[in-house]
Amino acid sequence: MANVVVIGAQWGDEGKGKITDLLSRSADVVVRYQGGVNAGHTIVVDGQVLKLHLIPSGILYPDTICLIGSGTVVDPRVMLGELDMLIENGIDISGLQLASTAHVTMPYHRLLDQAMERQRGERRIGTTGRGIGPTYADKSQRSGIRVIDLLDEQRLRDRLEGPLQEKNQLLQTIYGMDPLNADEVIAEYLAYGKRLAPHVVDCSRAIHGAARNRKNILFEGAQGTLLDLDHGTYPYVTSSNPVSGGACIGAGVGPTLIDRVIGVAKAYTTRVGEGPFPTELDGSLNDHLCDRGGEFGTTTGRRRRCGWFDGVIGRYAVEVNGLDCLAVTKLDVLDEIDALQVCVAYELDGERIEHFPSCSEAFARCKPIYETLPGWQCSTADCRRLEDLPEKAMAYLRFLADLMEVPIAIVSLGASRDQTIVVEDPIHGPKRALLSA
């Protein structure tokens, strides 16, 4: 048995959905432990493109239990829309389970999120406007609505009365918006609760039951390390903890249950929204990476900012998450570039540093120090074994592995499941006998 956490090692959008889908074949249970509909992942199966925001990738495997954990925030409208889409595509959803203690994104959360972002103007954070931050804020202030509250009308009414009065006052007085009608909100969310009720479970109990039965459990993170509320590029971060430690809190398990942590990183770097990005490119190279890599957000449709691979944040992700190995995605996007640059350090106020600065203002002043590697300028899309890769592509991967001081277990060369090279079984294989110099 092996219990594995999969995390993003950059700013999100690393291709975790595909890697989780690949690893789900060996998993009995897949747990989404944080985030909400602000995250999105795209999976391609037999040429069919499926875009999901809340439902774990493992839903495509009929014998796999997919659990949305207590650390997530759930928008029932989006979740039910995804379930309907899966049913229409002939996918069995009977294995889906939803934590009774997960918090619920209410209509006022979305309205306030969008209004606050507009009010920030040039100081905007770049939120998705889906209400994630306000939902987590209410959770911290102990005034949130949980999934279990949607199953009982009186409990929902009691829980909602105070918060809705407060939110309506904000909407009207501060933002000049119309108030929400309590009876309409209650009726709408009770209807959601009725549809979700068959899937609602005690999250921690379900996971520990699987662990006692020696099941393989895969914990799926959303977003990425540099968007972590505590360890990312604050304030340009999400409102939860995508790092591996967040799996324990968001799923209700202890750290001794985790056997291995796998990081996912693109062969280059992207970021969506605002915030510092030292290796960001402009001009034709940025356009090439964006167009060739299809760098448009699953959730927002926004064009992602693109840049060279940043080994400084890569090493930071290894340390913060305790990575055992790495999956490198979108190597094929670099196929046509003649010279590749990799950031190995920063120049900050005239000094060379090799660590990620905790101060966002200092990070914004960092200039990348690059090493240049030759490109391979031929297609890798059809490579299925490590030895099929061009030597220069192999050299690039070895350089990344050495720079980050972590072995590479998986190389992804496209969106489809079969466009993957598994160097070593990342779950059951030896922890350090993978691709390195």
From Swiss-Prot:
Plays an important role in the de novo pathway of purine nucleotide biosynthesis. Catalyzes the first committed step in the biosynthesis of AMP from IMP. GO terms for molecular function: adenylosuccinate synthase activity; GTP binding; magnesium ion binding. The gene is purA. Pathway: Purine metabolism; AMP biosynthesis via de novo pathway; AMP from IMP: step 1/2. Keywords: Cytoplasm, GTP-binding, Ligase, Magnesium, Metal-binding, Nucleotide-binding, Purine biosynthesis. It catalyses: IMP + L-aspartate + GTP = N(6)-(1,2-dicarboxyethyl)-AMP + GDP + phosphate + 2 H(+). Its main location: cytoplasm. It is found in: Cytoplasm. SMART domains: Adenylsucc_synt. One of its GO terms (cellular component) is cytoplasm. Homodimer. This is Adenylosuccinate synthetase. The keyword Iron-sulfur does not apply. Its EC number is 6.3.4.4. It comes from Synechococcus sp. (strain WH7803).
